[in-house]
Amino acid sequence: MASVFVSATSVRADQATQRAMIAKWAGSYDTDTFLRQPMVRAELQKLLGSEMRHLMDNLNVRGGVDLSGETLSVNGNAPHQGTEEEAIVCVTVLPLKTIVEAAILSKGAVTVFAREEKYENASICLKDWITLVNSGHADRFTQPANVRVSSPVP
């Protein structure tokens, strides 16, 4: 019975840590410090190895830290190379673990860096970004043919 109590306490503490991390970073423009967080930086270095410099070059021009569900993300592009040299880092903050993934678009190909070995197990954060870069960001600015916009009748 004591171990169940300890586990429940641990989960509550982890959930509080999760909420604190999300509250601290969501919407922040201090992306350099976010990317240098020990759990983020260490995992990126393990996943990317010699490609770490390429990732950082492709994140040179970036916005703030985005939040979707439990995932914090930073994406950007190399200077003057949007749609050609881009990257993303996705950090999914779960109660018992934090999952770090990254992807680089370079020379028309997307390379995913993750512990998961199958694409279907990648986060929605990565998959949505891949869909966006594969469209050349067109779907952000031009209405797709199968999308209708409806407004209330006055």
Regions found by a protein language model. Give the residues of each.
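Sec/Tat signal peptide C-region and signal peptidase I cleavage site
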Residues: 9-13
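Bacterial N-terminal signal peptides
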Residues: 1-5
